[in-house]
Amino acid sequence: MKKSLALLWTALLVMAASAQSDIQVTEPGFKVFQFPRTQIPRIDGDFTDWDIVPDAYSVSIDEMWDDTGKHKNIERSTLDIKVKVGWVKGLNRLYFLYEAYDDFWDFNQLGLHNDTYEIVVDGDLSGGPHTDEFRLNPKVKRRIDAFFEFQNQHAQNYHIMTPPTEGKSWTMVWGPQQWLKYLPYANYSYDYDFSHGESGRLRMEFYITPFDYASPEGPEKSVESRLYENKKIGLCWAVIDYDGETQNNGFWNLSKHHKMYGNASMQRLFTLMPLEPQFRKAVECDWTFTVVPDTRTVCFRDQSYGPITSWHWDFGDGTTSTEQNPTHTYARDYAHYVVTLTVEGPEGSARCCKVWEVCVRDMSHPSLTPYD
């Protein structure tokens, strides 16, 4: 009987561990606002850059819960939180506007004890554990070894001080990759008018750079997360609220799972949104291309915006195409092609010309025409 109970208990533990490892970030989640390239937020403490972000992008304390059980209900008279997240097409950065009211701001110590905005980001939605505490082989790998060899690599955790006491770093990067919190990978600015122990409102803007692989050896051996429209990422945060006591007075979590801080599968889903319509023209023209290696063949791809019914490509060599995404083989090795795409539709037309971007050379079958 005892043996049967032991086997049952072991099976239950295995099932519980398996269920936890199978947690997936699949719910609808939240939106990340795309800033136009001409309205990138300046990290300067002037928050008017964020006025263009609709309220639909706000994530309030209503989406959070105190997973310590100290607070069953939200009381905005003691703590209130609102966060907006943004991105810019072409930059692998996540921008944050953090606004909070607290009836007791706790920030007079030099250690980790501090009112804290803790964020965790998983830029490629890879999921899984990323702190030494949750290493998968604790019997053979020491926790300190896991810290240096594993922690913060495929997902990153930041403990942002809100605010830091004088002389203390603005954030604790929870891993050996301390370069993550410095320019050009991060920047920050605060605005507040209160002292330790007082009530008041804090606003903070900052950006971070998510990494698919953040190497302990430095950024030169790391891989940034590539951000693009409609990409879905893992992102989560918690607000650790101290009120002058040794223990915190709440761990206000955006995730349903307390251990989201070290397991990226417990984060929330965020989608990098396209530009809002008010920041776009009715018809916009753009295109990209890929050269087939060691040939003069180029694959062109239309990236235009709006209702478009016709395309006209001028490849810069006297030939044209009306396909949307043509493939063209040049007869000549050349580095000075001027390629133009013109698009038309019921709401207008637009043109995109790129000068000397398309360069081709076939080493196996060089053209006889002189380059110049």
PLM region descriptions:
Residues 2, 8, 244, 338-340, ...:
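A detector of low-complexity, intrinsically disordered, Ser/Thr/Gly/Pro/Ala-rich segments
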Residues 4-5, 86, 327, 356:
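Residue-level detector of intrinsically disordered/flexible regions characterized by low predicted structural confidence
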Residues 1-26:
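Bacterial Sec-dependent N-terminal signal peptides
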Residues 13, 38-39, 112, 310-312:
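N-terminal hydrophobic or amphipathic segments with adjacent small-residue motifs
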Residues 277-372:
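Extracellular/lumenal mature domains of secreted and surface-exposed proteins
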Residues 20-289, 365-368:
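Structural preference for beta-rich elements and adjacent junctions enriched in aromatics
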Residues 12, 54-55, 59, 345, ...:
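Residue-level detector of alpha-helical segments with a strong bias toward transmembrane helices
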